[in-house]
Amino acid sequence: MRDLQVISRTYPSGFKAKVIIRPDFYKKFMGIIVDFGGSDPQKLSGGAHFLEHKLYAKKSGDISYKFENLNASTNAFTSYNETMFYAEFINHWRQVLPLLFELVGTTYFTEENVTKESQIIAQELAMYQDDPSWQVNHDLLQKMYPNTKLAEDLTGTQSALNEMNPDILKDIYQKNYYSENLEFVACGGFTVGQAKNILIEVGKLQEYYFSQNNKKIIKNPPTLASATKDTTIKGDVSIPLVGVGIRFPSLLLMAKKLGLNPTELQILLQMMLQIRLGSSSSWFEAAQRREVINSPLSIDVTYTRQGSFATIIGASNKPKKLIEEIKLQITFGQILQSSFNLQKKDYIARNIRELDQIDDLAIEEAELALDNEKREDILNKVQTISFSEFCQIYEKILGESDIFTTILESEV
């Protein structure tokens, strides 16, 4: 595994920055990540995502055009616990850097531009809601984490979009966009000298644009799952869609008990579910022959501050049979050491490939930094964990988990 050359700095304000030097690449990346996302406390659902969109609006117009004039592209995303803004480019880092800070560090909210954005996001939400996989995933989350932001789409709800206004956006911004809640990352073909100069400029820019507040601890009171574990819903599908959700215990608390970090647990859980239910599992091949399943399952394990869960989604003309078999596999599925070793090799190979994907590498490094986690520590754990420890960890977590199911059938 190749070591990354990284130069880091923490400023007196608490703002953190790092430059990852990849000397053999022309491409460059700069981003600012915010330790705040869609499932964190906010007055209206979708507030974090709405704010992400509106930060591109400035008094002079859409700031994206300024990036384009430098032959740079800019984008952003909102996830459950973070928001990130970034730019990709080849040249002109000295011009791109202050633009990025202007993007994240200044606001321009008006009744007119907020109303217009509400209409745009409403169309985005409607598009998601028409997707059968979204419908199944949404129904599972409604049962696993009812009456929480996790149970609502990151884009919000129609009622929340109707209520959004400049004052609410200003409140979200002021509470979450401050020095100690932000981190900067650059990655790509920079020299050591350029990296040091970037960190000098970042120090000036963060001091100019962001206020200094003490880091706020986000409190997430425990939530109860729904008493209803199995539902059937109707939708526009030709083949029934099946969803199985696993609500895990707190991965943060479990990680402390097991001497791991939450990301390591997330990876190990993903590996186990792939071994038991993935396209290379013995079960999948047999299920295909028996026409229980049409195509590979979508398997995702998610860790958030508000709760952690897995969703397993697939299509089948025998939906009840598929659910029955998935539940059996989750609990009693065959685990071969050879499959475990293959999953480890696959994870290591993906890590190595990611080192050559400048944007993916930078985003993951920024995300890990927010949780005070390191890539090399996680990789070392995956490499060194024994087969027996792997199985014991899974059984321990599964023993404290609940399983929920959804079947999406045709309306006809």
Regions found by a protein language model. Give the residues of each.
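Charge-rich, well-structured scaffold segments of protease-associated domains
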Residues: 63-214, 258-260, 280, 285-412
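His/Glu-rich zincin catalytic helix
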Residues: 1-63, 170-286, 385, 393, ...
